[in-house]
Amino acid sequence: MFCVQCEQTIRTPAGNGCSYAQGMCGKTAETSDLQDLLVAVLQGLSAWALQARELGIIDSQIDSFAPRAFFSTLTNVNFDSDRIVEYAKDAILLRHSLAVRCRLLDSTITVDHPLAELQLVADDIPSLLQQSQQFALNNDKADVGDDIHGLRMLCLYGLKGAAAYMEHAHVLGQSDEQIYAEYHAYMAWLGTQPRDVDTLLNNAMGIGKMNFNVMAILDQGETQAYGDPQPTSVNVRPVAGKAILISGHDLKDLHMLLEQTQGTGINIYTHGEMLPAHGYPELKRYPHLVGNYGSGWQNQQTEFAKFPGPILMTSNCIIDPNVGNYGDRIWTRSIVGWPGVNHLDGENFAPVIEQALGMAGFPYSELEHLITVGFGRQTLLNAADTVIDLVASKKLRHVFLVGGCDGSRTERSYFTDFARSVPQDCIIMTLACGKYRFNKLDFGTLEGLPRLLDVGQCNDAYAAIMLAVKLSEKLGCTVNDLPLSLVLSWFEQKAIVILLTLLSLGVKNIYTGPTAPGFLTDNLMAILYEKFGMQPITTVEQDMQAILGH
């Protein structure tokens, strides 16, 4: 096992990365190694998808399957070895079918790629584990050096994040042939074990640019289906009655669950990254979408154990449900998996509903505590003139984007302290689950504008980017000249690709934490600082002083 993709990876003087029987996330060495094998198979599939395009063959099934299967290898998504093997088998079947179609047009066709003809050596996991050792991500690290290896990981993990957003967009009926072509090109290229520093850096930025377009179609899919988010008050305390908790990012799953639970007397609660759903007009119209439950994903083993109903996981993040003894009432969907728990293959949530009806639910309603969400792209753009007027009249000094992933590291209290320290003449935009560090605090208003603006899920960084672009256009300056600072927390691969997106757009002077990614060497961090001014957080006082200048 070798995995260095998340923020909580093991760090030692000898090197970084989880390399024992189990990773810090709970992923076993078996599952980790099989995921490496799956990635290699998917790189070969992408090589064929590229070759097929030269013959005019575009296979929509492969285009949707490839990023979905890749998504299953993200942190805290799928821990089920059997499911990972099934993805690999399906990938090879799809590749074989595509090769047959290509050879009908050109019988001499070959694909010049080291993984183009990769086959699984057997069906049994012990044999596949032995085969997977060929594809361990650190196999040639000693040969190529830490910097090259780190840049490869930056590209690989960034592409994983983009693949996740591609799948979210696909679920909502959004696709783009050019995006799929770029995805396959980057995926196939990574399978060649690239060694050139400049190419690696350029392609990391290319993956970021591609992801900007992915986030655009995802935003389009969400707003076309459910309307533009509107500022909405959300109760974060329990309401008496039977209950289902839904977590993850998949708004379509939430919509289907709301439809199927109408009239049942079951209340639906959002968790984690599902919180922004309350701002969408077509979702918040359901009266039994009663509120949000819990906090950051890392606290789920305690919070889920106390929830008196079933829990539906639609995407990341899932962690071991056996710790809190709720494994019998957690249900996984789509790419999510945990060995031994219930998995829903289709879109019928009847088993979840039946389980909820058989449970007690919350015995009484607690006193309401309301927070506000729904400051999505259109709402932010509509507020652009107000923001400009406040800046011009010197009533608004600075805007901070403080958000990203949450996690269990104690150093993450920095983000709570930072938000608390933002002066009264400044506002905070936030997004992703990092908001749970401070989103239940009362920040008040500034000239009628809430000082805390919840922009949405991690992919809604797109909304913040579009606001920054509009403000810069109206003010006749660059984004980097705006009174805007980004202070981002990272944990997994979606955060990595959002960072690459921001850098690819030329956004500079981003603060990141709580630690540097384990795969980025001091040399690489120095390059990112030199090119983009990207720097690790220090102390709240020091960073605030550097940003505001006094």
UniProtKB/Swiss-Prot annotation:
Catalytic activity line of the entry: A + NH4(+) + H2O = hydroxylamine + AH2 + H(+)
Annotated GO biological process: response to hydrogen peroxide
The keyword Iron is assigned to this record: yes
Binding site for [2Fe-2S] cluster: 3, 6, 18, 25
Cellular component terms per the entry's GO annotation: cytoplasm
Location in or out of the cell: Cytoplasm
GO molecular function (one): hydroxylamine reductase activity
Entry binding sites for hybrid [4Fe-2O-2S] cluster: 249, 273, 317, 405, 433, 458, 492, 494
Keywords per UniProt: 2Fe-2S, Cytoplasm, Iron, Iron-sulfur, Metal-binding, Oxidoreductase
Residues with the Cysteine persulfide modification: 405
Family matches, as InterPro entries: HCP/CODH (IPR004137), Hydroxylam_reduct (IPR010048), Prismane-like_a/b-sand (IPR016099), Prismane-like_sf (IPR011254), Prismane_a-bundle (IPR016100)
Keyword hit for Lipid metabolism: no
Top EC class for this record: oxidoreductase
Cofactor mode of binding and number, as noted: Binds 1 [2Fe-2S] cluster. Binds 1 hybrid [4Fe-2O-2S] cluster.
Record-listed E.C. numbers: 1.7.99.1
Job description of the protein: Catalyzes the reduction of hydroxylamine to form NH(3) and H(2)O.
Family: Belongs to the HCP family.
Name listed for the protein in its UniProt record: Hydroxylamine reductase
UniProt organism field: Yersinia pseudotuberculosis serotype O:3 (strain YPIII)
Gene name in the database record: hcp
